[in-house]
């Protein structure tokens, strides 16, 4: 069951609406997606700018966001047989990379202000029965803002986070592969051209709780998906229990 657990809609900084995301992934046979729009802290200049520009979920927009996710989840199930999980990306952006942190909540049902410490944010996600995932915690291999704060605190946060992204888009992160931490792989899609990326594969029941439990238990594998519209489709499997870490290049 092919899954992408990190993507953005027009509720934050994505180019596609939620229905368009459902159609993009559903038409390609995905079994599970999580829509995870940014929810930025509102106490910093960067966070305030995101609110001004309409690039973040807010207490005012969050109820409508959940309502549309619920409606589209029903359509996705009926039209594509695809599971849609509600999520957000708690976003703490600083001018300094080592103070910036992004954390996914998947399976969420309640708004969580992003201004708290990451330790408290993870607990606020998990108390809802959702999973907390460190988003792109190391260098993404792209020229963009980096978010190192969770990785800097990985020993402290290891017991509070359910998984760490081992890939974001087309790049695998050697540091996370070698860490022994639980992992997922996702695309961090903002526009259709980013569809080709590493994905997570589940072999569990197609049910929200089964998927969340598979993340917690690490009953999953990774697969590179290259969309046929942008090139020849190729799938390459990487299983969590058989990563061949010793053959990987040195970590960055």
Where are the predicted features?
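Hydrophobic beta-strand scaffold residues
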Residues: 84, 132-133, 183
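Beta-strand-turn-beta hairpins that frame and shape the catalytic cleft
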Residues: 80, 97-101, 127-131
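Generic beta-sheet signal
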Residues: 87, 135, 186-187
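An N-terminally biased module of ancient metal coordination in phosphate/nucleic-acid-related enzymes
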Residues: 1-86, 90-91, 122, 152
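Conserved beta-strand positions in the central sheet of alpha/beta enzyme cores
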Residues: 34-35, 133-134, 165
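Aromatic-lined carbohydrate-recognition surfaces of secreted/lumenal glycan-active proteins
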Residues: 131-143
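Charged catalytic cores and adjacent phosphate/nucleic-acid-binding surfaces used
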Residues: 1-9, 18-23, 44, 93-110, ...
């Amino acid at each position: 069951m092919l899954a992408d657990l990190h993507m953005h809609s027009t509720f934050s900084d994505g180019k596609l609406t939620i229905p368009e995301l459902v159609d993009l992934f559903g038409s390609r046979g995905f079994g599970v997606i999580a829509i995870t729009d940014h929810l930025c802290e509102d106490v910093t200049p960067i966070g305030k700018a995101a609110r001004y520009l309409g690039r973040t979920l807010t207490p005012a927009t969050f109820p409508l966001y959940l309502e549309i996710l619920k409606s589209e989840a029903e359509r996705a199930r009926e039209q594509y047989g695809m599971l849609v999980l509600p999520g957000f990306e708690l976003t703490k952006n600083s001018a300094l990379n080592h103070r910036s942190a992004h954390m996914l909540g998947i399976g969420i049902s309640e708004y969580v202000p992003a201004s708290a410490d990451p330790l408290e944010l993870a607990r606020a996600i998990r108390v809802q029965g959702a999973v907390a995932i460190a988003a792109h915690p190391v260098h993404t291999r792209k020229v963009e803002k980096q978010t190192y704060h969770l990785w800097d605190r990985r020993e402290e946060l290891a017991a509070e986070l359910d998984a760490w992204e081992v890939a974001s888009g087309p790049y695998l992160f050697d540091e996370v592969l070698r860490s022994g931490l639980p992992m997922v792989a996702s695309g961090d899609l903002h526009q259709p051209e980013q569809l080709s990326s590493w994905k997570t594969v589940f072999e569990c029941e197609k049910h929200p709780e089964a998927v969340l439990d598979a993340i917690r238990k690490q009953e999953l594998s990774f697969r590179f998906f290259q969309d046929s519209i942008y090139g020849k489709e190729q799938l390459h499997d990487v299983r969590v229990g058989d990563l061949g870490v010793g053959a990987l290049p040195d970590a960055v």
